[in-house]
From Swiss-Prot:
The active site is at residue 171. Belongs to the short-chain dehydrogenases/reductases (SDR) family. SDR65C subfamily. It comes from Datura stramonium. Keywords: NADP, Oxidoreductase. Substrate binds at residue 158. The keyword NADP applies. This is Tropinone reductase 1. It comes from the Eukaryota. GO terms for biological process: tropane alkaloid biosynthetic process. InterPro entries: NAD(P)-bd_dom_sf, Sc_DH/Rdtase_CS, SDR_fam, TR. GO terms for molecular function: tropine dehydrogenase activity. Catalyzes the stereospecific reduction of tropinone to tropine.
């Protein structure tokens, strides 16, 4: 094969596996899986904007990313507030000149209680953060995603949206809703060249989970029960989730939409609980 043709093929291949020149908004990017997602996308060439409720944590992260040479900006946002969500998207539109390639609805909360003990406040926090905020952000991001001519929406679901897990009925309901929303938006927005997918992690060893395990023997027992039923025999790492999200955003994944992909070491394939 002629050298020029080989060079052209290599160039095209690199483009399929790169996020260079793209823009991304990642919610809840100051810790855990969100932090890994920000680093993953920025490391692959994307300009990333993120948000957090905690200003101190966010500022520390932004400084670390600057030192690493990553193109990341961010601001404080309480995603339970519709007004603050609107303000966030206005800022993103300004920073990225009205175009957004990637929206990762990562931010989420979980409260552990028996179903009979959940309060109205619990309901508002869980459904407001996990479902309403993600839905609304997708709505107001739609013009920016469409304008990019290559839009991607990624939702963070969970194995709890598929398997019945103990003491998280509201959380499970919010993730089940996310799964159905993924399919609906994927079909509705395909005509606008916007792909919509969900990633559903299993047990992931974030710093918060590791701290909880050390402080609470019951928490460690619950995690161990998950791992016993996981064919790969271990918990996952945040980077193993962020890598899957990056893949779904690559041009190489251009025919994948409407999917809920489990990143759980085989837990759901093995029947869950």
């Amino acid at each position: 094969m002629e050298e020029s043709k080989v060079s052209m093929m290599n160039c095209n291949n690199e483009g399929r596996w790169s996020l260079k020149g793209t823009t991304a908004l990642v919610t809840g990017g100051s810790k855990g899986i969100g932090y890994a997602i920000v680093e993953e996308l920025a490391g692959l060439g994307a300009r990333v904007y993120t948000c957090s409720r905690n200003e101190k944590e966010l500022d520390e992260c932004l400084e670390i990313w600057r030192e690493k040479g990553l193109n990341v900006e961010g601001s404080v946002c309480d995603l339970l507030s519709r007004t603050e969500r609107d303000k966030l998207m206005q800022t993103v539109a300004h920073v990225f000149d009205g175009k957004l390639n990637i929206l990762v609805n990562n931010a989420g909360v979980v409260i552990h209680k028996e179903a009979k003990d959940f309060t109205e406040k619990d309901y508002n926090i869980i459904m407001g953060t996990n479902f309403e905020a993600a839905y609304h952000l997708s709505q107001i991001a739609y013009p920016l995603l469409k304008a990019s001519q290559n839009g991607n929406v990624i939702f963070l679901s969970s194995i709890a949206g598929f398997s019945a897990l103990p003491s998280v009925s509201l959380y499970s309901a919010s993730k089940g809703a996310i799964n159905q929303m993924t399919k609906s938006l994927a079909c509705e927005w395909a005509k606008d060249n916007i792909r919509v997918n969900s990633v559903a992690p299993g047990v992931i060893l974030t710093p918060l989970v590791e701290t909880a395990i050390k402080k609470n023997p019951h928490q460690k027992e619950e995690i161990d029960n998950f791992i016993v039923k996981t064919p790969m025999g271990r918990a996952g790492k945040p980077q193993e989730v962020s890598a899957l999200i990056a893949f779904l955003c690559f041009p190489a994944a251009s025919y994948i939409t409407g999917q809920i992909i489990w990143a759980d070491g085989g837990f759901t394939a093995n029947g869950g609980f």
